[in-house]
From Swiss-Prot:
Part of the 30S ribosomal subunit. Forms a tight complex with proteins S10 and S14. Binds the lower part of the 30S subunit head. Binds mRNA in the 70S ribosome, positioning it for translation. It comes from Chloroflexus aggregans (strain MD-66 / DSM 9485). Belongs to the universal ribosomal protein uS3 family. PROSITE patterns: KH_TYPE_2 (PS50823), RIBOSOMAL_S3 (PS00548). The lineage of its organism: Bacteria, Bacillati, Chloroflexota, Chloroflexia, Chloroflexales. This is Small ribosomal subunit protein uS3. PANTHER family: 30S/40S RIBOSOMAL PROTEIN S3, SMALL RIBOSOMAL SUBUNIT PROTEIN US3C.
């Protein structure tokens, strides 16, 4: 099942958190859910060149707080904050509610699965060798401290007549382990030959929810040699015979 289940959905409530944080019932839930989808589409469209990884939405009675995680905060904010003000006005006009925008920078985009997948997809669209793009992405992630990376591309790769799957991997990616911090993303690259699917798994290490990581990985100390029980002398079977 580790190959089938979504790596982030599998860990929700344990080491991963939801990207929409609010509660509603009945028709209100449906309305707010569709509103979240439209807000994410609008933000992704307006900030297409800003390297947006994820968008988190929190709601209160008359206010919506949106956190945008991006690799290029300068593009999002704009000169003297003009871009972010324009985006905020567009979101308030669409929802009719007060919007608070938080722009958060991603310091290491090479370790963000969404940004890595989008980068590979963009290179494939520009007819860069898919093998080269995948290998470079794996090497960069491992160089920056990832414990494991796996990238899979599927479709009519390099314009082949028959669709196939190509995979590049390094390190380990434990998909069954709940405490394993795995970042996952899936994007599509549109080429003249059809659509290419790109999936990225990045394993960043283990997360221990109820205790510090340092305490959990410490091994029990070995008893000193003076306190160890002496081993009984080996019985000589030849002598007894």
């Amino acid at each position: 099942m580790g190959r089938k289940v979504h790596p982030i959905g599998f860990r929700l409530g344990y080491i991963k958190d939801w990207q929409s944080k609010w509660f509603a019932e009945g028709e209100t839930y449906t309305k707010q859910l569709h509103e979240d989808i439209e807000l994410r589409k609008l933000i992704s469209k307006e900030l297409q060149s800003a390297g947006v990884s994820r968008i988190e939405i929190e709601r209160s009675a008359n206010k919506i707080e949106i956190s945008v995680y991006t690799a290029k905060p300068g593009i999002v904010i704009g000169k003297r904050g003009t871009n972010v003000d324009t985006l905020k006005s567009a979101l308030e006009k669409k929802t009719g509610k007060k919007i608070k925008l938080n722009i958060k920078e991603i310091s290491q985009p090479e370790l963000d699965a969404q940004l890595v997948a989008e980068s590979i997809g963009e290179q494939i669209t520009k007819r860069v060798s898919y093998k080269r793009a995948m290998k470079q992405a794996v090497q960069r992630a491992m160089r920056l401290g990832a414990q494991g990376v796996k990238i899979r591309c599927s479709g009519r790769l390099a314009g082949a007549e028959m669709a196939r799957v190509h995979e590049e991997a390094e390190g380990r990616v434990p998909r069954h382990t709940l405490r394993a911090d795995i970042d996952y993303a899936q994007v599509h690259a549109h080429t003249t030959y059809g659509r290419i699917g790109v999936k990225v798994w990045i394993y960043k290490g283990d997360v221990f929810p109820n205790q510090s990581a340092k305490a959990s990985v410490e091994q029990p100390a070995t008893a000193p040699a003076s306190e160890r029980r002496e081993r009984a002398p080996r019985r000589n079977s030849n002598a007894s015979a």
